[in-house]
């Protein structure tokens, strides 16, 4: 047996012994009738204590004679005879406990506390003081076991090293990894910040169906489910767009929704089949208004959450404080592939030749607009590090966007890129019911030709447009990718609490 295998076997034996010992301790607690109490009430979290009292000297704390009650998980313990120091972790961070035998009721220190394990959840009451090293601590006069942990924590020095385990057992990741906890706190702040920003601009938050008879609003492969009561196949939504625009038809002129979308596609550092989007629709506005709104949203969130408009992402600094760059799709192709003859992008055969020369397999169902878009994605997208708006998307790849008044082959649409990734997509909405019907027919033809991401024909949505959709602009922003930027995370799994994983066999 190799040394590595021997160490692994020893680790399994040690774990089994640990589990056995902890269960025996729980059995003893059950016999004493003191297991899993639910009557302890704390009055402070660790961050509240640090914020209020870190700046005070020990003499001042003694004079104030402040008694507090805290609760949390025991992360470390140093037993030094008749006294011990404990690190207690709660939602706000960590606080140190000073536990002395003679300051607790008789028997608690030796017969209870010393038999508890790391990972156990404790309740503690006592008075605040500072140690000789200046660390804010609680001198305990009451200590109770609230929850017995039957499994040990990850190694305190190395944390949870197995990346797969971090995602599968997120609870362990959150216990042992400060960075992960902070990531999801920032995520929550971003969601709250978006909602406040939108409400301040007069938008109403709404909810639309997650299960749909016809999936629409994006080019993607849907998940299929079955509604037993209706005996009807349904689809998990790929986007809420068409329902939100129905609401604008109905008179709700500014609406937004933050919720999940589902796309039955590949998994990568940027893609999870279940992801969170914010979509908004604003009547009597165009895509240029959304460009201003998007810039303001990112600038506001950065300032409010991070306290600055410069955000570190990898080895670059993203600047949300200055105006974002704006390029047309063709300008971006030319910028990052200077040898491109712009006239070639107006000719199907020439554009196809360019695409094939850079390794793109051109499908038979693609038209010129799709080919130009694929060229852009291949040669330019990865270079769009600083916040950049790309405009003038071909109508062929924008079946829901309004055609440009001057050039009907392109649409009044933009996509928003940061860090080489698409973060958002917005456009002036197509409100011509007849044009929309024809574009749906074009999508049906593309689907019949083998494009399984082409859209379905949504007759009810066309009917809604026939009742009149005001001039409207719509925007969708990927929340997960936004959180990646704000937390310097480089895989989407790091910002989704429970990402999609293949089951362990």
UniProtKB/Swiss-Prot annotation:
The keyword Metal-binding applies. Belongs to the class-II aminoacyl-tRNA synthetase family. Homodimer. It comes from Shigella boydii serotype 4 (strain Sb227). It is found in: Cytoplasm. InterPro entries: Aa-tRNA-synt_II (IPR004364), aa-tRNA-synth_II (IPR006195), aa-tRNA-synth_II/BPL/LPL (IPR045864), Lys-tRNA-ligase_II (IPR002313), Lys-tRNA-ligase_II_bac/euk (IPR034762), Lys-tRNA-ligase_II_N (IPR044136), Lys-tRNA-synth_II_C (IPR018149), NA-bd_OB-fold (IPR012340). GO terms for molecular function: ATP binding; lysine-tRNA ligase activity; magnesium ion binding; tRNA binding. This is Lysine--tRNA ligase. Keywords: Aminoacyl-tRNA synthetase, ATP-binding, Cytoplasm, Ligase, Magnesium, Metal-binding, Nucleotide-binding, Protein biosynthesis. It holds the Pfam family tRNA_anti-codon. Mg(2+) 2 binds at residue 422. Its main location: cytoplasm. GO terms for biological process: lysyl-tRNA aminoacylation. Mg(2+) 1 binds at residues 415, 422. PANTHER family: LYSINE--TRNA LIGASE, CHLOROPLASTIC_MITOCHONDRIAL (PTHR42918:SF15), LYSYL-TRNA SYNTHETASE (PTHR42918). Binds 3 Mg(2+) ions per subunit. Transmembrane segments: none annotated. Its EC number is 6.1.1.6. The keyword Transport does not apply.
């Amino acid at each position: 047996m190799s040394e590595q295998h021997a160490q692994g076997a020893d680790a399994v034996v040690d774990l089994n012994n640990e589990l056995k010992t902890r269960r025996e301790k729980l059995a003893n607690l059950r016999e004493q009738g003191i297991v899993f109490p639910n009557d302890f009430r704390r009055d402070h979290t660790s961050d509240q204590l640090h914020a209020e009292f870190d700046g005070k000297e020990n003499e001042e704390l003694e004079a104030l004679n402040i008694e507090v009650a805290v609760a949390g998980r025991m992360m470390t313990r140093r037993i030094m005879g008749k006294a011990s120091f404990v690190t207690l972790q709660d939602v706000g961070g960590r606080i140190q406990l000073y536990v002395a035998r003679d300051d607790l009721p008789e028997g608690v220190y030796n017969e209870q506390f010393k038999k508890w394990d790391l990972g156990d959840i404790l309740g503690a009451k006592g008075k605040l003081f500072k140690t000789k090293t200046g660390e804010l601590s609680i001198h305990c006069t009451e200590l109770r076991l609230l929850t017995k942990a039957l499994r040990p924590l990850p190694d305190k020095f190395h944390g949870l090293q197995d990346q797969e385990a971090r995602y599968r057992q997120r609870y362990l990741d959150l216990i042992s990894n400060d960075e992960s906890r902070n990531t999801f706190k920032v995520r929550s702040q971003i969601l709250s910040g978006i909602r406040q920003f939108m409400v301040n601009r007069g938008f109403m938050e709404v909810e639309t169906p997650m299960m749909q008879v016809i999936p629409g609003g994006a080019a993607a492969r849907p998940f299929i489910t079955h509604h037993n009561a209706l005996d009807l196949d349904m689809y998990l939504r790929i986007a809420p767009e068409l329902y939100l625009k129905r609401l604008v038809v109905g008179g709700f002129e500014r609406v937004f929704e933050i919720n999940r979308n589902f796309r039955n596609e590949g998994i990568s550092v940027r893609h999870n089949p279940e992801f969170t989007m914010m979509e908004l629709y604003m009547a009597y506005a165009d895509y240029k208004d959304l460009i201003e709104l998007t810039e303001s949203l990112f600038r506001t969130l950065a300032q409010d959450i991070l306290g600055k408009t410069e955000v570190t992402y990898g080895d670059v600094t993203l600047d949300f404080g200055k105006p974002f760059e704006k390029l047309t799709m063709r300008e971006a192709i030319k910028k990052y592939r200077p040898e491109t003859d712009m006239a070639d992008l107006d000719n199907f055969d020439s554009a196809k030749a360019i695409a094939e020369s850079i390794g793109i397999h051109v499908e038979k169902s693609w038209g010129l607009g799709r080919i130009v878009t694929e060229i852009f994605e291949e040669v330019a997208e990865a270079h769009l590090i600083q916040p950049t708006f790309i405009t003038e998307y071909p109508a062929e790849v924008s079946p829901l966007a309004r055609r440009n008044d001057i050039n009907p082959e392109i649409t009044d649409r933009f996509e928003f890129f940061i860090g080489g990734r698409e973060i958002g997509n917005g456009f002036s909405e197509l409100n011509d019911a007849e044009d929309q019907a024809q574009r749906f027919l074009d999508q049906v033809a593309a689907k019949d030709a083998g494009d399984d991401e082409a859209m379905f024909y949504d007759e009810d949505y066309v009917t809604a447009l026939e009742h009149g959709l005001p001039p409207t602009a719509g925007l969708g922003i990927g929340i997960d990718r936004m959180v990646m930027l704000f937390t310097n995370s480089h895989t989407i799994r790091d910002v989704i609490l429970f990402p999609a994983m293949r089951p362990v066999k």
